[in-house]
Amino acid sequence: MREILHIQGGQCGNQIGAKFWEVVCAEHGIDSTGRYGGDSELQLERINVYYNEASCGRFVPRAVLMDLEPGTMDSVRSGPYGQIFRPDNFVFGQSGAGNNWAKGHYTEGAELIDSVLDVVRKEAENCDCLQGFQVCHSLGGGTGSGMGTLLISKIREEYPDRTMLTFSVFPSPKVSDTVVEPYNATLSVHQLVENADECMVLDNEALYDICFRTLKLTTPSFGDLNHLISATMSGVTCCLRFPGQLNSDLRKLAVNLIPFPRLHFFMVGFAPLTSRGSQQYRALTVPELTQQMWDAKNMVCAADPRHGRYLTASAVFRGKMSTKEVDEQMINVQNKNSSYFVEWIPNNVKSTVCDIPPIGLKMASTFIGNSTSIQEMFRRVSEQFTAMFRRKAFLHWYTGEGMDEMEFTEAESDMNDLVSEYQQYQDATADDEEYEEEEEYEAEA
């Protein structure tokens, strides 16, 4: 079976990860002790993708949990599904990274990384045919960003041909936790561009907006945000965990979504949006799902797809529905909004149908888009980075851990290159190339 190894790092990564496992366990009928109590064969058919079956018939998540301080992990362990994880797979230090990327990547994190890699190796050896890794982390702090990217590059070295998927929470302008977020995020993106295959971009600001506007929650807590993230993650991974009419795996996802290797940062959306307590009481139709899913307000990252163009997109529909209707709806969206899709990639929207809906819903859909408008987000972080870096503010925290200013300059220009690559493809039209070729012809003649 094609297994996926899940790794979560830092405070944010561990909280999102814990939530993700709660959702996945519920969908597969697995209780908090790891025993199966579900009612459908389909729940077990591809359970090996995320779980290892222990000798006593219990299912243990293929998960590695790491952090540089014990706090968050203790709360995961004492949480609702804390007892389901393998105890040896909790790897933590005592010092903390203090929101410092350099501590996570070079000093504190580097001391802990070997014990994390040992656990990763052990889990990978337990797999029949490992298809890839998924990493949950945030880019604003120290551990998830610094140590997370260190781990990704080490795994890259050791398993060069396996797919690396990340769920990365970007810092957002309104919800700031630390003043050095732009530094940490830029240094991380520099790593992710090189070492990750696919990055699902999540963003606290967009999540707040959804909670506030759509779900009418006046004071959204991190629990509410994580509920949304876990719904999205469950949707992105559902066709890997359940049989369906149009299946896909991490590699197929990448092949359909990434036209150029560096442009692998995806916007994700989810429909129908529900708050934690209230699942919707009316059944949705495929057209309604489609309409909601493409809506800019449903995107969980703070970039507006209407400001750019889609290079590629992919939709995962869940529930009992006709594939024909799904295809018609997707074609309909493309025809009506053709200006928002680049015309030089025909048929650039793919859809997948998975038969099992999320808990409490009859139908749902998840959207994954590779849109040039995501440059807004990089641009925003880059501006904040430059403002501080120009004055060398807070830099001593990083140089004190042995970093060089040169690294900052490199990361900054890499981020700006990424933005201009997105811009270049946004402006490109199908006819550009033809003219250039004709000119060459004439020149030769």
UniProtKB/Swiss-Prot annotation:
Instruction: Show the CDD domains listed in the entry.
Output: beta_tubulin (cd02187)
Q: What is any one of the record's Gene Ontology cellular component terms?
A: cytoplasm
Q: Which cofactor does it need?
A: Mg(2+)
Top-rank taxon: Eukaryota
Provide the residue positions that the database annotates as binding Mg(2+).
Answer: 69
Major site of localization recorded for this protein: cytoplasm
- GO terms classed as biological process: microtubule cytoskeleton organization; mitotic cell cycle
Where is it localised? Cytoplasm, Cytoskeleton
Protein name per UniProt: Tubulin beta-9 chain
Q: Cross-referenced Gene3D superfamilies, in alphabetical order?
A: Helix hairpin bin, Tubulin/FtsZ, C-terminal domain, Tubulin/FtsZ, GTPase domain
What Pfam family is a match for this entry?
Answer: Tubulin
Q: Where is the composition biased (Acidic residues)?
A: 429-445
- InterPro entries linked: Beta-tubulin_BS (IPR013838), Beta_tubulin (IPR002453), Tub_FtsZ_C (IPR008280), Tubulin (IPR000217), Tubulin/FtsZ-like_C (IPR037103), Tubulin/FtsZ_2-layer-sand-dom (IPR018316), Tubulin/FtsZ_GTPase_sf (IPR036525), Tubulin_C (IPR023123)
Q: Which UniProt keywords apply?
A: Cytoplasm, Cytoskeleton, GTP-binding, Magnesium, Metal-binding, Microtubule, Nucleotide-binding
Q: How does it assemble?
A: Dimer of alpha and beta chains. A typical microtubule is a hollow water-filled tube with an outer diameter of 25 nm and an inner diameter of 15 nM. Alpha-beta heterodimers associate head-to-tail to form protofilaments running lengthwise along the microtubule wall with the beta-tubulin subunit facing the microtubule plus end conferring a structural polarity. Microtubules usually have 13 protofilaments but different protofilament numbers can be found in some organisms and specialized cells.
Per the entry, what this protein does is: Tubulin is the major constituent of microtubules, a cylinder consisting of laterally associated linear protofilaments composed of alpha- and beta-tubulin heterodimers. Microtubules grow by the addition of GTP-tubulin dimers to the microtubule end, where a stabilizing cap forms. Below the cap, tubulin dimers are in GDP-bound state, owing to GTPase activity of alpha-tubulin.
The family note in this entry says: Belongs to the tubulin family.
GO MF entry, a single one: GTP binding
What residue spans carry the region label Disordered? 423-445
Where GTP binds, per the record, is at 11, 69, 138, 142-144, 204, 226
